UniProtKB/Swiss-Prot annotation:
GO terms for biological process: defense response to bacterium; innate immune response. It is found in: Secreted; Target cell membrane. The keyword Metal-binding does not apply. The gene is DRT-S. Its main location: secreted. Expressed by the skin glands. This is Dermatoxin-S1. InterPro entries: Frog_antimicrobial_propeptide, FSAP. The lineage of its organism: Eukaryota, Metazoa, Chordata, Craniata, Vertebrata. Residues 1-22 form the signal peptide. Residues 23-44 form a propeptide. Belongs to the frog skin active peptide (FSAP) family. Dermatoxin subfamily. The keyword Repeat does not apply. The modification Glutamine amide is found at residue 76. Keywords: Amidation, Amphibian defense peptide, Antibiotic, Antimicrobial, Cleavage on pair of basic residues, Immunity, Innate immunity, Membrane, Secreted, Signal, Target cell membrane, Target membrane.
Length: 77
């Protein structure tokens, strides 16, 4: 009877140890996925920001060019 009890404890222990390793791996995988999601959100936000800055710079450049053209025409006339 004692041999059977020891065998059952050994089987239970050997079953629980790999289970805990699997849970740790799963948690690490979930953490990596969360980090990947955060990084992709940051990249998208940065892309949107750069797009907005680019259009603002283009608008300002166009306004400066128009003003410069007017100054040149006034100086010639």
């Amino acid at each position: 009877m004692a041999f059977l009890k020891k065998s059952l404890f050994l089987i239970l222990f050997l079953g629980l140890v790999p289970l805990s390793f699997c849970e740790n791996d799963k948690r690490e995988g979930e953490n990596e996925e969360e980090q990947d999601d955060d990084q992709s959100e940051e990249k998208r936000a940065l892309g949107t920001l750069l797009k907005g800055v680019g259009s603002a710079v283009a608008t300002v450049g166009k306004m400066v060019a128009d003003q410069f053209g007017k100054l040149l025409q006034a100086g010639q006339g």
